[in-house]
Design a protein with these regions (language model features):
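Short alpha-helical DNA-recognition segment
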Residues: 12-34
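The alpha-helix within a helix-turn-helix
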Residues: 8, 19, 48
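DNA major-groove recognition helix of helix-turn-helix
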Residues: 33, 43, 59-62
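A short, Lys/Arg-rich alpha-helix, primarily the initiator
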Residues: 1-10
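Helix-turn-helix DNA-binding elements, focusing on the entry/boundary residues of the two helices
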Residues: 4, 15, 26, 41-44
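Short, charged recognition helix plus adjacent turn
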Residues: 10, 49, 59-75
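DNA major-groove recognition helix of helix-turn-helix/homeodomain DNA-binding modules
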Residues: 23, 42-57
Length: 75
């Protein structure tokens, strides 16, 4: 199971709920989740926010699920 699907299930969200949270069409979201389509930077950002994780976690650059603390983000 990929990280996107794993996080969605952990949160108890449906694909329709993800559409509502991100604005990504449900059919496109399904393709992202099943690896049939790559997400754009903007889609990755929206997904990370909706799932309360970091973009790095979604793209397998880290194993840390939690998003970076706000104090380390640029303003």
């Amino acid at each position: 199971m990929n990280r996107l699907k794993q996080l969605r299930i952990e949160k108890g969200y449906t694909q329709v709920k993800m559409q509502m949270l991100t604005g990504i069409d449900q059919s496109d979201y399904s393709k992202l989740e099943n690896g049939k389509r790559y997400y754009t930077f903007e889609q990755c950002r929206k997904l990370a926010i909706a799932l309360d994780t970091s973009m790095d976690y979604l793209v397998n650059l880290t194993d840390e699920k939690r998003p970076y603390p706000r104090s380390h983000q640029k303003k």
